[in-house]
Amino acid sequence: MNTTEVMETASDLLDGVIYDAEAFSVQDCQYIADLLASQGYALRVKPEFSLVYAVPEQVH
């Protein structure tokens, strides 16, 4: 994934889009997770359902 694709994917995730986990490499997920974290969100992966989605970070 290039930088533009990572940014577009992160934006889609913030908009509530759910992706197939098989579409991303581990490195792609790390880049996306870092970008989401900067926006106060966390990347969640549910391998048993092959889903990738964003959730708001918990405030402690």
Where are these regions (language model features)?
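A short, charged, amphipathic alpha-helix used as a generic interaction element across diverse proteins
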Residues: 6, 24-43
